[in-house]
Amino acid sequence: MSSEDEDQVQQHTPESEPEWWDQPGMPWNEKPTKADYWCLGWFGFVGIFGLAMIPLRAWLLGLDPPIMLALTGSRIGAASTGALASVGEAQHWLLYLLIGSIVAIKFDWIYWWAGKLWGRGILDVQAQNSKRAAKNIARVEQWAIKLGWLGIFLAYVPIPLPIAFVVFVLMGMTEMPLWKFLVLDFISKTLWSLGYFALGWWIGEPVVYVLEQYARVANWIAIGLVVVIFIGAMRRQRK
């Protein structure tokens, strides 16, 4: 075969296609291990859990506020309990609040783990969904890096940005020990719950109404974030 024929064969030889795990939009940068699959599976579980809880929202809102606070750790539960405590109708409220803090952070370790396993990969997956998502993530990441571990205490700011998601992932990226992350996360959540409790104590029913309206939006944003990450990764894996 002449050199000219060899050149023609090389020109027509298709380049080897990248492996499925190396496709754009996957959180990992190498062939996934069992840990990667487990972490991705936990993301799927969180999404399913969040969707399953939606029909229970009306039931939860109808519970005695301290019980709702202990079961969910929600802002509404904390504020409602504060309103009751101000008139002496919520004994042992601190115990309910502390239990609620533990319940509220039960899945946060998954985001820390994703950051430890995949680094910015998990942020890039979410940023690819839209220009707005990419802009919001970049904005949060910028100030979160400057704050370092103190960013955990701003993770629960009630604004429609993926603050907790980005901050928790960054804590995993920076190799913060899991025990330290969970302790700081628990303290942060407890302080914020005490803040909502105080608002309920001082203001009463109006602050509860405002938090209810915010929760309607925030819950859907949080669930949508997890579902998009899980479904996007699974669809690309099948390809």
Residue ranges of each PLM-predicted region?
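Hydrophobic alpha-helical transmembrane bundles that constitute the permease/transmembrane domains
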Residues: P162-V166, F186-L194
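Transmembrane alpha-helical segments of integral membrane proteins
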Residues: L194-P206
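Membrane-interface alpha-helices at helix entry/exit sites of multi-pass transporters
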Residues: A90-I99, R132, M173-T190
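Hydrophobic cores of alpha-helical transmembrane segments in multi-pass inner/ER membrane proteins
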Residues: A79-A83, G224-F230
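Membrane-interfacial helix-loop-helix
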Residues: M1-D64, G88-P160, G204-I221, G232-K239
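Transmembrane helix boundary and interhelical junction motifs in multipass membrane proteins
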Residues: L56-Q91, I159-L170
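Hydrophobic transmembrane-helix microenvironments that flank and shape a buried ionizable site
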Residues: A70-T72, A104-I105, F186
